[in-house]
UniProtKB/Swiss-Prot annotation:
Protein name: Endoplasmic reticulum chaperone BiP
Family from the record: Belongs to the heat shock protein 70 family.
GO biological process: cellular response to antibiotic; cellular response to calcium ion; cellular response to cAMP; cellular response to gamma radiation; cellular response to glucose starvation; cellular response to interleukin-4; cellular response to manganese ion; cellular response to nerve growth factor stimulus
Positions of the UniProt region annotated as Substrate-binding (SBD): 420-500
Site of covalent link Glycyl lysine isopeptide (Lys-Gly) (interchain with G-Cter in SUMO1): 353
Positions bearing the Glycyl lysine isopeptide (Lys-Gly) (interchain with G-Cter in SUMO2) cross-link: 352
Keyword check for Lipoprotein: no
Entry keywords, A to Z: Acetylation, ATP-binding, Chaperone, Cytoplasm, Endoplasmic reticulum, Hydrolase, Isopeptide bond, Methylation, Nitration, Nucleotide-binding, Phosphoprotein, Signal, Ubl conjugation
Record region (Interdomain linker): 409-419
MF terms in GO: ATP binding; ATP hydrolysis activity; ATP-dependent protein folding chaperone; enzyme binding; heat shock protein binding; misfolded protein binding; protein domain specific binding; protein folding chaperone
Stretches for region Disordered: 631-654
List of residues that carry N6,N6,N6-trimethyllysine: 585
Length: 654
């Protein structure tokens, strides 16, 4: 009898377990979607990490645009935005500004003045009226337009995963009220998605940076400057529990406004040059808008950008340059105005600047260097968290949340996985480890530095890539080596070699070296499993590094002192040999005295590479005692002040 009871219990257990499995199976892979005003983004938690998914155009962010062509075709995303210039009345965007609001809402009345498509009142709500081709007009609720964008994101995820997606986590601004949240959920339902959670965008961004994993209570300021909106939120996190303490911002400030300022500038400039007013040609204005947006993006990484438009207006071409300085000047008042909501949020939460533990930048417009500078200055030099693309951070956090809801066990330590566990760098003269990426930097990340040659007419530099915490490469772990050849003959320290380290989300390191003079390049790719360390080795190395820190410091000082003497001697040698500089101003006796002293020190260096710090310092002092009286004499006769250090610009040598 006992046996049957046990068997029944087992059966029951199996049935419950199977039911749980079924339940989990029903959910499938849950995706995280950032449904933005101007752009949307989708991510998924897969194989223990977040993947942000590129759309069919290869873009990781998709314009929140829907268009209806005269032929009756419906376009969503990039395709819709691309034909905005030719079909502005039937291209719908900014639906997020209308969703969940009533027709009489003052912000709706303000918005519809600026939208190129028609917004009408229906059931006390704003509806969008468009021509869907074949002479037919149709009205859509904002939820339906948002649903079309969500469908596009859902299809993007399905194409990547190779299976149906039915469940999602969708983000909304922290200030969205219940009606707006419910309307967003409804948009999901229309798109065939079960929206399991609606989470606040700033919370999602904080989760993306793993800030929910920190011990104790933390204050986090999220600065979110997107395409059309600006939101500042102050969150507190206490052991994984988030609370939005205060929010502020400007629902009408973002990248589009910066574009508008630049456009107005060029429209005025064009009128001044040609006497023609472009404003009345909708298509020309939209063409300009598209090119200005491209130029603005380019200016986040370069100092000027060209804007070229063929047959811009009445058959005439348009060609102008926009510099970063001009872009900043045109928008400076808007950039500065972003600080007021930050101040307000601090006041509302009763906190001082120094109480903020983390600053998180979100939204594509936070890539603008001036914005980053203003935020950093406001917080007295405190650096914001970095490492996740600002336009992907919200979707990233939504995907983490989605992973938890999918029942993925791996989400536990997620964000700890996504850092670079050890410092990465290259070997420079004297076996010194020159750091490019410090340990615990969140990946993906990219860092560049300029180096130079260590000897005259050096045709090749060898780039040795190491990981580890010790100041000297011999104590660190060699990851790979490659050569950059074909460097044209030049004195030491003259060639400029830019070394770039880039780690992608999969922890794959790419190191590139480029001779800035010739454009000559070479690179190496280092993957996780190739030659990498185990977590135990990493831990041991970090502990060792602390133990050895003191002796390492002494050794590095010795090498630095030697390098100082060497640089001083070679710099003098070059100047004495240059008739344009010191060489042309010295008397023959003085020249001979200096040449002899310099040669003597160079020879001594070659045979005493391992001398003590004191020896190197003494030799440098001896040389200075010979050189300085001669140079002082020159000063007396009005010569220019050549110092021994003149040409040694601050570049490490390879």
């Amino acid at each position: 009898m006992k046996f049957t009871v046990v068997a029944a219990a087992l059966l029951l257990l199996c049935a419950v377990r199977a039911e749980e499995e079924d339940k989990k199976e029903d959910v499938g892979t849950v995706v995280g979607i950032d449904l933005g005003t101007t752009y949307s983004c989708v991510g998924v938690f897969k194989n223990g990490r977040v993947e942000i998914i590129a759309n069919d155009q290869g873009n990781r962010i998709t314009p929140s645009y829907v268009a209806f062509t005269p032929e009756g075709e419906r376009l969503i995303g990039d395709a819709a935005k691309n034909q905005l210039t030719s079909n502005p009345e039937n291209t719908v965007f900014d639906a997020k500004r209308l969703i969940g609001r009533t027709w009489n809402d003052p912000s709706v009345q303000q918005d519809i003045k600026f939208l190129p498509f028609k917004v009408v009142e229906k059931k006390t709500k704003p509806y969008i009226q468009v021509d869907i081709g074949g002479g037919q007009t149709k009205t859509f609720a904002p939820e339906e337009i948002s649903a079309m964008v969500l469908t596009k994101m859902k299809e993007t995820a399905e194409a990547y995963l190779g299976k149906k997606v039915t469940h999602a986590v969708v983000t909304v601004p922290a200030y969205f009220n219940d009606a707006q949240r419910q309307a967003t959920k409804d948009a999901g339902t229309i798109a065939g998605l079960n929206v399991m959670r609606i989470i606040n965008e700033p919370t999602a961004a904080a989760i993306a940076y793993g800030l929910d994993k920190r011990e104790g209570e933390k204050n986090i300021l999220v600065f979110d400057l997107g395409g059309g909106t600006f939101d500042v939120s102050l969150l507190t996190i206490d052991n994984g529990v988030f609370e939005v303490v205060a929010t502020n911002g400007d629902t009408h400030l973002g990248g589009e406004d910066f574009d508008q300022r630049v456009m107005e500038h060029f429209i005025k400039l064009y009128k001044k040059k040609t006497g023609k007013d472009v404003r009345k040609d909708n298509r020309a204005v939209q063409k300009l808008r598209r090119e200005v947006e491209k130029a603005k993006r380019a200016l986040s990484s370069q100092h000027q950008a060209r804007i070229e438009i063929e047959s811009f207006f009445e058959g005439e071409d348009f060609s102008e340059t926009l510099t970063r300085a001009k872009f900043e000047e045109l928008n400076m008042d808007l950039f500065r105005s972003t600080m007021k909501p930050v101040q307000k949020v601090l006041e509302d939460s009763d906190l001082k600047k120094s109480d903020i533990d983390e600053i998180v930048l979100v939204g594509g417009s936070t890539r603008i260097p001036k914005i980053q500078q203003l935020v950093k200055e406001f917080f007295n030099g405190k650096e914001p968290s970095r490492g996740i693309n600002p336009d992907e951070a919200v979707a990233y956090g939504a995907a983490v949340q989605a992973g938890v809801l999918s029942g993925d066990q791996d989400t536990g330590d997620l964000v700890l996985l996504d850092v670079c566990p050890l410092t990465l760098g290259i070997e420079t003269v004297g076996g010194v480890m020159t750091k490019l990426i410090p340990r615990n930097t969140v990946v993906p990340t990219k860092k560049s530095q300029i180096f130079s040659t260590a000897s005259d007419n050096q045709p090749t530099v060898t780039i040795k890539v190491y990981e580890g915490e010790r100041p000297l490469t011999k104590d660190n772990h060699l990851l790979g080596t490659f050569d950059l050849t074909g460097i044209p003959p030049a004195p030491r320290g003259v060639p400029q070699i830019e070394v770039t380290f880039e780690i992608d989300v999969n922890g794959i390191l790419r190191v590139t070296a480029e001779d800035k003079g010739t454009g000559n390049k070479n690179k190496i790719t280092i993957t996780n499993d190739q030659n990498r360390l185990t977590p135990e080795e990493i831990e041991r190395m970090v502990n060792d590094a602390e133990k050895f820190a003191e002796e390492d410091k002494k050794l590095k000082e010795r090498i630095d002192t030697r390098n100082e003497l060497e640089s001083y001697a070679y710099s003098l040698k070059n100047q004495i040999g240059d008739k344009e500089k010191l060489g042309g101003k010295l008397s023959p006796e003085d020249k001979e005295t200096m040449e002899k002293a310099v040669e003597e020190k160079i020879e001594w260096l070659e045979s005493h590479q391992d001398a003590d710090i004191e020896d190197f310092k003494a030799k440098k002092k001896e040389l200075e005692e010979i050189v300085q009286p001669i140079i002082s004499k020159l000063y007396g006769s009005g010569g220019p002040p050549p110092t021994g250090e003149e040409d040694t610009s601050e570049k490490d040598e390879l």
